[in-house]
Regions:
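Mg2+/Mn2+-dependent nuclease catalytic core
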Residues: 160-291
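Metal-dependent nuclease catalytic cores that hydrolyze phosphodiester bonds in DNA/RNA
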Residues: 1-174, 190
Length: 292
């Protein structure tokens, strides 16, 4: 088997509207008789979990980083500096929008995100059984650390729900969960708040993979995002051959709502380390309700 063959079995993404929101069929209305209505239900737009999760996030440091990258990109491109000097920003809005975009591109601001997206897919392929030697050499250390690190923990990947689209119907929010993990033995988890949680064999938890250089700026949004995933009301099985773009499924069984595992493997590091962090989803859910 080669990576090319594996790529063909990647799960399709759900249909989206013009704002990038997932198109998902909501549950049928319940009639006074207590039975579900048989009326045809059209797909509706569900806000992405990542969008909601970032609502309360302090973006100051991220915005400053973006500004620094634009300044750096301008320093690399004489033509952009000339364009800026030759136009008035109040009268030439589109020109300056293009200058900012091109300066950001020159600074390779999307490089880390692209590498992270690719690494997510490589992890999925590795979990499907793809041999380490078939991956690009520069990502093999990342995949090795991921596989070795996860193998030492008392979890099994719930493969049928890898990259699973979920829906939180009451709030019209949806997202894609990287992994659901099932406990192979009982463990005790101590959160940063000091709260102790006992997990039983067979319990399932959300596993969220992050590949950014640092987690410093995103703890709140990551916890909210995982809380949305853990509290989902239904799964959405994407099928572009279906008239509605997919079919609804049941909530993932035995899933805990109080704790999730964050799996961090930085994509831009040549010798990465795998770090695991437990997330307090009760706090994340409270923050989600505030954001809504």
């Amino acid at each position: 088997m080669t990576p090319v063959n594996v790529v063909t079995i990647a799960k399709p993404e759900p249909k989206r509207d013009s704002y990038g929101r997932y198109q998902i069929t909501a549950p049928p209305k319940i009639l006074q008789s207590g039975k579900p209505s048989k009326a045809k239900v059209k797909p509706r737009s569900y806000t992405r979990a990542t969008t909601v999760a970032k609502t309360l996030e302090d973006t100051y440091k991220l915005n400053r980083w973006s500004q620094r990258m634009v300044a750096y990109g301008m320093g690399l491109r004489e033509d952009l500096r000339d364009l800026a000097m030759g136009h008035n920003p109040d009268d030439s809005l589109q020109v300056f929008e293009n200058i900012v975009d091109e300066a950001s591109t020159a600074a390779e601001t999307a490089r880390a995100a692209n590498k992270g997206t690719a690494l997510h897919r490589f992890f999925e392929m590795a979990d499907q059984g793809e041999a380490l030697s078939t991956f690009p050499r520069h990502v093999q250390p990342h995949i090795k650390k991921y596989k070795q690190g996860m193998a030492t923990k008392p979890f099994e990947i719930v493969h049928e729900h890898t990259e699973q689209v979920i829906a939180l119907d009451d709030y019209k929010v949806a997202g894609t969960v990287d992994r659901f993990l099932q406990l192979t033995e009982p463990i005790q988890v101590c959160l940063q708040t000091g709260k102790v949680i006992n997990l039983s064999q067979g319990d399932r938890i959300v596993g969220d993979i992050k590949t950014g250089r640092t987690l410093e700026w995103g703890w709140l949004s990551m916890t909210v995002q995982a809380a949305i995933y853990a509290n989902h009301s239904a799964t959405w099985n994407v099928d572009h051959g279906h008239p509605q773009g997919g079919t609804r499924g049941e909530r993932v069984s035995s899933l805990r709502r109080d704790v999730a595992l964050l799996i961090h493997v930085p994509a831009v590091e040549e010798d990465p380390q795998l770090e695991l962090y437990w997330l307090d989803l009760e706090a994340g859910w409270d923050a989600f309700l505030t954001a809504m």
